[in-house]
């Protein structure tokens, strides 16, 4: 089992603070905010599949935004009343990594949700590398688009 210090060294300080202590990266600074390549986004801690580029949109909020997770069972929602706000925190199911928050102001035609996710909590797997990275079972989602 990986220690917290080993995890910090593997994923970096910012990703560690975001995923393990629910920190938030500054708006418009994350590598995936204005990034729209074809592929999937996985938890930087565990590698579990979270989101697809098919559901990513430009919300203008400064963080990557998705209309839904790749499958509803991949994330969990939690009440968050930190910083004097009432929000819904989003975590990865397996690792319990803090990812960001979900809001009810997303594209209406896509279900109305906006998953506002920290880039530091994610690792992008390009479509053409999914098979070699061990994510071949998810290639089929792109056939439906």
UniProtKB/Swiss-Prot annotation:
GO terms of molecular function: peptide-methionine (R)-S-oxide reductase activity
Disulfide bonds: none
Pfam families linked to this entry: SelR
UniProt keyword Oxidoreductase present: yes
EC number assigned by the record: 1.8.4.12
GO annotation, cellular component aspect: cytoplasm
Keywords: Oxidoreductase
Any single GO BP term: protein repair
Residues of the active site: 116 (nucleophile)
Enzymatic class: oxidoreductase
Chain segments annotated as transmembrane: none
Reaction catalysed by this enzyme: L-methionyl-[protein] + [thioredoxin]-disulfide + H2O = L-methionyl-(R)-S-oxide-[protein] + [thioredoxin]-dithiol
Presence of keyword Manganese: no
Domain MsrB: 4-127
Origin: domain of life: Bacteria
Record-linked PANTHER family: METHIONINE SULFOXIDE REDUCTASE, PEPTIDE METHIONINE SULFOXIDE REDUCTASE MSRA_MSRB
HAMAP family: MsrB (MF_01400)
Family: Belongs to the MsrB Met sulfoxide reductase family.
This protein's name: Peptide methionine sulfoxide reductase MsrB
Record gene name: msrB
């Amino acid at each position: 089992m990986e220690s917290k210090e080993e995890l910090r060294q593997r994923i970096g300080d910012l990703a560690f603070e975001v995923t393990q202590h629910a920190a938030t990266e500054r708006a418009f600074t994350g590598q995936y905010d204005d990034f729209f390549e074809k592929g999937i986004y996985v938890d930087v801690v565990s590698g579990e599949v979270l989101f697809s580029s098919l559901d990513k949109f430009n919300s203008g909020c400064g963080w990557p935004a998705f209309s839904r997770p790749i499958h509803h069972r991949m994330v969990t929602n939690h009440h968050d009343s930190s910083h004097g706000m009432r929000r819904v925190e989003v975590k990865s199911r397996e690792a319990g990594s803090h990812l960001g928050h979900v809001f009810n102001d997303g594209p209406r035609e896509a279900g109305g949700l906006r998953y506002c996710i920290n880039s530091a909590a994610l690792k992008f797997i390009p479509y053409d590398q999914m098979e070699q990275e061990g994510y071949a079972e998810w290639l089929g989602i792109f056939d439906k688009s």
